[in-house]
């Protein structure tokens, strides 16, 4: 029977199992939902591989959201959904006001990297894991270093800036998931779980926004 298949068909049969084994960084985001066998550091590595691929500013959306959401804790997902509700409420109420006055939106998280930091740290091109530390029962802090690449025109060489942060991983439903983040070198030192003053209960309670 193998003779009738031909050499090409036999080759395809032999490599078929390998074709189904995709690395995490290249797999479809929907396939990352089952990460029960991963260590805290492995979960962080997969999460930040996606983050440095999509580089979302503010709340992840689209493909970034589909990739990152399954790797987050239920608490963190609820927090981001609340922020999204506040963001929707803000633009529903003030979009016309912002356009008329040419004001920048007054949402604190809109241009931040929620899992890497503000300003240039918001869009890292690379990351490295420096260390990990158990900080409680089924709770691990992973220390990260981010690299931001600044490119220039006219033949000038790129410049690289480095930032650091700590991501917290917790055990939930027998798997490790991302639960919190704090950027280092930022004053005041604020965790993502501390929330934002302008957002309460899914509604925007801050100011509409003014020029700097």
Where are these regions (language model features)?
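Low-complexity, intrinsically disordered terminal/linker segments enriched in charged
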Residues: 136, 141-166, 170-173, 177-212
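Bacterial N-terminal signal peptides
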Residues: 7-17
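Boundary at the C-terminal end of the N-terminal hydrophobic targeting segment
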Residues: 18-20, 25
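Core segments of small alpha/beta cavity-forming domains
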Residues: 32-111
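Surface-exposed, charged secondary-structure patches
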Residues: 81-155
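Positively charged n-region of N-terminal signal peptides that target proteins for export
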Residues: 1-4
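Residues embedded in well-ordered secondary-structure elements
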Residues: 6-9, 133, 156-158
């Amino acid at each position: 029977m193998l003779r009738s298949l031909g050499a090409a068909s036999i080759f395809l049969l032999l490599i078929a199992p390998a074709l189904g084994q995709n690395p995490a960084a290249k797999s479809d985001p929907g396939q990352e939902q089952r990460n029960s066998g991963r260590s805290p550091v492995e979960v962080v590595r997969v999460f930040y591989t996606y983050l440095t691929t999509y580089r979302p500013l503010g709340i992840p959306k689209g493909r970034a959201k589909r990739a990152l959401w399954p790797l987050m804790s239920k608490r963190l997902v609820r927090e981001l959904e609340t922020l999204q509700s506040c963001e929707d409420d803000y633009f529903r109420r003030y979009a016309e006001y912002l356009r008329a006055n040419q004001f920048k939106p007054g949402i604190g998280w809109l241009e931040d990297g929620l899992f890497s930091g503000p300003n240039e740290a918001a869009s890292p091109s690379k990351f490295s894991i420096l260390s990990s530390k158990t900080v409680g029962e089924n709770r691990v802090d992973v220390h990260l270093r981010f690299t931001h690449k600044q490119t220039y025109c006219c033949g000038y060489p790129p410049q690289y800036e480095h930032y650091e942060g700590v991501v917290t991983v917790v055990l939930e439903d027998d798997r490790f998931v991302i639960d919190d983040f704090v950027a280092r070198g930022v004053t005041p030192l604020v965790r993502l779980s501390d929330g934002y003053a302008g957002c309460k209960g899914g509604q925007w309670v801050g100011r509409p926004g003014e020029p700097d």
